[in-house]
A protein has these predicted regions:
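Sequence/structural signature of beta-propeller domains
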Residues: 34-444
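Short, charged juxtamembrane terminal tails flanking transmembrane helices
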Residues: 468-471
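Gram-negative bacterial Sec-dependent N-terminal signal peptides
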Residues: 2-33, 458-459
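General helical secondary-structure elements
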Residues: 7-9, 284, 462-465
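Generic alpha-helical secondary structure signal
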Residues: 6-7, 21, 43-46, 241, ...
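A short, hydrophobic C-terminal helix/tail in secreted or cell-surface proteins
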Residues: 447-466
Length: 471
């Protein structure tokens, strides 16, 4: 993912299986079920795939050769259909609740004229399934990165762009992401109670507190606690609330593990806190300088966030730190910070410490069984997706294995998202390729009966199966 800093830019539902042949559709009811995924059944890849060695429409070497991949949207096609699309497709979210839950994917454009698009997974027409909802440059939106579905049924994104004197670093809510038909009727609202930072990861805990980060060398981790955590709309949720910066072992330190406390950087209503909050010229709060005043613990380019819920109900917040090649875990029940993955973690392919083979961890994703995936911010030929094993769920991984490797020249993989209604489907974007043709790729584990048909030589382009909500 690109790292946008003001003035300077630093680099930083349908289950479809890819084969050839006819479209088979099987309608069925959605139902809740315990999840079991086939994505953890693989032999770790020993090395990267060579840059440019695979077609852009199927750019990944996958660690299990039975898994399939198919392009479900690409930018060149969108432009040919007259859709405004500035490219650099970034993080992915789906409509996880409400009517037609799981039907749509949403993603922002991480460009100087950013926007938001939606992919309809139930639309078989490749030319019409993807629609731009927020036109590039709306409200001066730049560097769209964050992507999250809210508990009340809307879509959040935010700007990965912040610096002293900036007007960016804002959080936005698309309040009608499912019902909007395009740019003409979408409702895109800035939520100004959130302090300005260089946004990437967003996550809600079970109490509906919202976590976010400042992607910066020396960036902090934050928690927003709404005065109305059970709000049924964003107007009420973001009306008033307090933001805190994480302190580990007392704060005022770097890359720390140990005891967690939360230091306020705003008052209870989201306004300035005397002696702590730093105001921008427009009256908004500078989250970065305010966290420094509150002695928030600094991490080195914290990027994506994920929350995992354990069987006992405890929740662990994970954060990737790109500069230090680490992933941290923060147990929100015990208030303990740990190092989840670093250079000393064992590589499943060699049995030795992974060292600098794992480089620039950026995105995180969690599958239906709670397994963690780490996506590198690297160019094609070096960009890998890693599977992390934490068998005892203590927040410290025992090993990592290379799960996929991407070949597309000039690109990086981003936004890995596991379908909440089918544990054997995932989506990932191929961002800023040299060709300029960003893509969304669907990766799938064939169901046993489907795989048998493949072995028998029967062809499928798509297979719509019963959608099962994952618990």
């Amino acid at each position: 993912m690109y790292y946008f800093q003001e003035i300077h830019i630093f680099k930083k539902k349908t289950l479809a299986f890819l084969v050839s042949g006819a479209l088979i559709t099987m309608a069925g009811t959605m139902q809740a079920s315990a999840a079991s995924t086939g994505f953890d059944n693989f032999t770790a890849l020993p090395s990267n795939i060579a840059a440019g060695s695979l077609p852009e429409s199927s750019p990944f070497q996958l660690a299990n050769p039975s898994w399939t991949q198919v392009s479900i949207a690409n930018r060149t096609n969108q432009l040919s259909q007259g859709q405004a699309n500035s490219g650099n497709w970034d993080m992915i979210a789906a409509n996880e609740t409400g009517t037609d839950a799981g039907r749509y994917l949403f993603m922002p454009f991480e460009t100087g004229d950013a926007g938001v698009q939606r992919i309809d997974l139930l639309n078989p027409d490749y030319n019409t399934r993807t629609v731009t909802l927020v036109a590039p440059g709306t409200q001066g939106f730049v560097a769209g990165d964050a992507s999250l579905w809210t508990p009340w049924g809307s879509y959040l994104t935010a700007e990965e762009s912040w610096g002293a004197g900036s007007t960016k670093g804002r959080l936005f809510e698309l309040t009608n992401p499912v019902t909007a038909t395009g740019t003409g009727d979408s409702n895109f609202v800035q939520r100004s109670v959130i302090p300005h930072v260089s946004h990437e990861g967003l996550a809600f805990d079970k109490d509906n507190s919202m976590y976010f980060i400042d992607e910066f060398n020396g960036g902090s981790i934050y928690k927003y606690v709404s005065a109305n955590p059970n709000a049924t709309n964003g107007d009420d949720y973001f009306a008033t609330g307090q933001t805190f910066a994480m302190q580990v072992n007392g704060g005022g330190n770097d890359n720390a593990t140990g005891a967690i406390t939360w230091a306020p950087i705003t008052d209870a209503n989201g306004g300035a806190l005397a002696g702590v909050s730093v105001l921008n010229s427009d009256g908004s709060i500078d989250g970065r300088l305010s966290a420094d005043n509150a002695l928030g613990t600094n991490y080195q380019r914290p990027e994506d966030l994920e929350i995992k819920t354990l069987d006992n109900g405890d929740q662990i917040l994970f954060a990737a730190t790109t500069t230090t090649d680490e992933v941290y875990s923060f147990n929100l029940a015990s208030n303990t910070a740990s190092l989840f993955v670093n250079a000393s973690t064992i590589d499943q392919a060699t049995g030795l410490a992974v060292g600098d083979v794992l480089n620039n961890p950026d995105n995180l994703a969690i599958d239906a069984e709670g397994n963690m995936y780490i996506i590198e911010d690297q160019p094609g030929g070096q960009a890998d997706i890693w599977f992390a094993t934490d068998a005892n769920n203590d927040g410290v991984a025992e090993s990592v294995g290379r799960w996929a490797s991407m070949s597309t020249d000039g690109a990086e993989p981003t936004g890995l998202y596991f379908d909440k209604f089918n544990p054997n489907v995932a989506y990932v974007n191929v961002q800023h390729p040299s060709s300029g043709d960003d893509r969304t790729i669907m990766i799938a584990v064939p169901e046993p009966e489907t795989y048998a048909m493949l072995l028998a030589g029967l062809g499928l382009i798509g297979f719509s199966a019963r959608r099962r909500k994952i618990r």
